[in-house]
From Swiss-Prot:
Name the UniProt record assigns to this protein: Large ribosomal subunit protein bL19
Function: This protein is located at the 30S-50S ribosomal subunit interface and may play a role in the structure and function of the aminoacyl-tRNA binding site.
Taxonomy, superkingdom: Bacteria
Any single GO CC term annotated in Swiss-Prot or TrEMBL for this entry: cytosolic large ribosomal subunit
PANTHER family: LARGE RIBOSOMAL SUBUNIT PROTEIN BL19M (PTHR15680:SF9), RIBOSOMAL PROTEIN L19 (PTHR15680)
Record carries keyword Chaperone: no
Similarity field: Belongs to the bacterial ribosomal protein bL19 family.
Organism annotation: Polynucleobacter asymbioticus (strain DSM 18221 / CIP 109841 / QLW-P1DMWA-1)
InterPro entries in the record: Ribosomal_bL19, Ribosomal_bL19_CS, Ribosomal_bL19_sf, Translation_prot_SH3-like_sf
GO MF: structural constituent of ribosome
Keywords: Ribonucleoprotein, Ribosomal protein
GO BP terms in the entry: translation
Amino acid sequence: MNLIEKIEQEEIARLSANKTLPSFAPGDTVVVGVNVVEGARKRTQAFEGVVIAKRNRGLNSSFIVRKISSGEGVERTFQTYSPLIASIEVKRRGDVRRAKLYYLRDRSGKSARIKEKLPARKVAATPAA
């Protein structure tokens, strides 16, 4: 591991020490709590939508969340290790076969729905008679 990678790993450990990042993937519906400063007031703003892309690049990792607001599509890119992100909560797991869901930009209504990923069923081993 070279020096830059080592420094990036230390920075990731420092930034993620006080908060836990859940594992999520494209297709999942997430609620991202964003710290917003308005004048002297600081508050947390929730942004809920579908993760359409995830970019894993160490300290430069990011993800794009898309939602429909007042009939208009809104996308927001978040840096995974940004101090502006207060929390990430996974509301629903999506079952998709693509890493990037940019095709959802062209779709609306029922065609833009994503199937829910159901937890795997445990098969009980029955002894043969």
